Structures are given as C-alpha cells and as structure tokens.
C-alpha cells in the first residue's frame, strides 16, 4: 500500500525504533528550548536525564542518533557552544584515539585471545572459580592498562565464544561462514542452551567489568583521573598506591568476596553455569583448532603473543599515548600475520567507531554541564562543610555525580576546587592529600552503578555483543547493584574510618613523607 511523503519521513525518522520512543525524542526536542528559556539550570539537568534515557533504551535504538539530535539542539539554542564541545574533544583526544586504534588492534589479536581463554574455559569447571579468574585478570590488567582496552579484550573473547556455539547450534561446521547475529537457523532444541549460554557470558562480562574498576582505582596509571589527581598531588607510582591502599585494599577484598557470593547464591542474574552441550562444543572446537593448526598459524600465535607483551609494557610504562600504541599494534599485527587487504582491515574498525561517535556526543553533554555549571551547588555545599565532614561528603558527592557524568570530568572538577583551596591556605596539605584520596576513590568506585560513569561500561553496553547477550542498560544496573552497594559502602567506611589513622601510621613508619610545599600550577579543566 503506497504511503504519503509525510508518512515516509515519519517512518524514516529513527528507523525501526518503536513509535512511543520516536514520540518521546520529539517531545524532548520540543521541550528543551522552552525549558532553557525559562530556566537554563533546570534545562541542563533535563538534558542530562534525557541523554541517560537514550542510553537506557540502547536496545531500542542506538543512542548516537537520539543523543546526537539532543546535543545538536543544545548547541543551537545556546546551552553550550561548538567551541566548548571542540575543547572537550581535544581534552579527551587520548580516549578517542584509544577507541579508534586500540580496539581495532585487539581485533587482530583475536586468535591468541581465543586460544588462551578457550583453554581457561575448558579447564576450569567451577563457574565460581572462572568468575573469580575473570574478575582477577581484569583487575590486574586494569591496574596497568586502560579499562577500555581490557573490556575490548573481554568483548572480543566473549564474541568469539558466542559465535562458535551459535554456528554449531545453527547446524554448521566450525569452518563454515556464519552470521551469529541471526537466530533463525538455531535449532529449536538448542535455543534453551543458547539462552543459558547468554546468561553465562553476561555474568562473566559483568565480573570482568567490575574487575576493571577494582584494579583501576589502585594505581597511578589505572584510570585517566588517577593521573590527573596524582599529578596535582605530586605523587609517584608507589606513593599513589600506598595512599590509596587504606581504601582500595578492603574494597578489593570485599569485591572478590561479592563475586563469590553472588555466584554461589545465584543472586542478581549471576550463577548461570556453562551448559554441558556448550562445553562439549568448546572442547570439540579446541580439538578442531589443534588438529588444523599449521606452521603459519603457530607463527601467528607467537607473533601475537610478542605483540601482547609489547602492548602491556608500552601501556604500563607509558611509552606513548594509548591510541598510538594501539596503532602500532595494528601495524605490527597485520604486517607480521599477512593481513594486507583493505576490506580485511576495515572490519576491525566496525566495533569501535560508532561508540567513538557516541562518546563525542557524550562530551557535548559534559560541555553543557560545564557551561551551565550544573555541579556548582554540590561543589559549594561540600567545600563549605566542616573539615571533619569533608572526607565523607567529597566521597559521596563524587560518587553520586560520577553515576550520571564522566568520572574523569568529575574528578578533574573536584581536584581543581580542592587545589584552589590549598593554594589559598583554606585547607592544610595533610587535608588536601586525604581529600585527593577521597576524590579518587569516590569517582572510581560508586560509578560502577550505571554505564554512564565509566567509559568502559558504556562501551560494553553499546557494543555489538550486548544485544546478542540481551545485556540492556537496566540489566547492567541490576547486575552491578551488589557491587555498587559493597564497593560504595566499604569505600565510604574506609574513607571515614581507616584513611586518616592508616595514613598517619604510614607517616610514622616512614612509608610516606609529608611534603609541605604545594605545587603552584592548577590543572587545566576540560
């Protein structure tokens, strides 16, 4: 039946998204200019809530399009400027380079990753031990590498596992080409196993994601905001780890205990075991790969292992920007394994580029937060508090704001304000260093509550794997909830009760030396 041009425009708008979703986005676009005219501050927070809505509905429509429309309108009506958006993008160029090059680099190491993790999956029969292994490995890697890189590895591995089983359950051989996004060919008898396998992979993904937060908070190079805070406090790698330890050690231990508890008790969507049918297929796949592995294949694995070593050393020692190391991985991995066709290279960039564009939209929202000073009332309230109450309030304020905004931005804002207070002699050097710990742990730990707070979580939510595993925004929040409560509360208790006394003990033991000379330069805010 022919349709009018107007109906065609309506159908084309946001494609296959539900009609109610399209209506909601149009309503947002209509309301925002009116709200901005009446009260810019309220309009700013309204935009933040709307953007969170687009993330929450990621399985209905990829957030880039609706979020991008909201961001474009925000610039047009004056909530922020194109110059401020560009400033945010320039300030975060390393994150953007990382997404463009590092994620693509990991793609060319899939053979090695599948080889290692298939062995791990087959040999560890206990789901609890396997979950703990994923959490620990992610935590260890995230202490030295960027969390986005670690999540890219985990996504690559999980996608590989999913594709293998999906291919066999669709009646195909290991060597046959297959589209693992299409369930139509999956045998009816295998659908329950496929659903169980999805639940199994979902839980492993979430344990690994939490592991990146547990490890990332511990060291100077673990997260971008750690570097900013550590630089302003004048801490080296060792001093940073020691100063954070009164909070990070109890949190790390309790985080691992939570991993065991939720698996054993099958709470919050955890506890799904690997179906026997899937395990047999993985074992068959392992034997198939071993039998068919040629000298060239072995050479590729050796090359990829050497590149993995370079990747870890390069990132841990900060030999270059993360994205540039990723570019070197692409060049080395492709040239030494014989991948030279342009279309073969292009596949590697398919996963990361949509998210890179989405992150640019996210930074546009951060630009609105800055220009409309949405966090200013909270910051002023915390700084006006008594010194004894400041540690807990800084931790809580950072945690709450990091749940809705980029934790790098939140950490930078607060360390700026605290540094200003130090230079104006409003607080002592001792108080400044304790507050720096509270800010760092506050931005890193409670932010696991939602995908908004950590770029690695957002990357996982918007990856091509998330819809395959039925990993929605709501499900991520639900599965993160036990970790949010444990990490947040243990972190709060440690900041309030342990940080001061243990820091004093470190001074007495000679592990730390108080530097009364404050650095003169303020960090540059995004």
Curated annotation (Swiss-Prot):
It is a multi-pass membrane protein. GO terms for molecular function: sodium:proton antiporter activity. It catalyses: 2 Na(+)(in) + 3 H(+)(out) = 2 Na(+)(out) + 3 H(+)(in). Its main location: membrane. The keyword Ubl conjugation does not apply. It holds the Pfam family NhaB. The chain crosses the membrane at residues 25-45, 52-72, 89-109, 130-164, 204-224, 242-262, 307-327, 350-370, 391-411, 448-468, 479-499, 505-525. The keyword Ion transport applies. NCBIfam families: NhaB, PRK09547.1. Belongs to the NhaB Na(+)/H(+) (TC 2.A.34) antiporter family. Na(+)/H(+) antiporter that extrudes sodium in exchange for external protons. This is Na(+)/H(+) antiporter NhaB. The gene is nhaB.
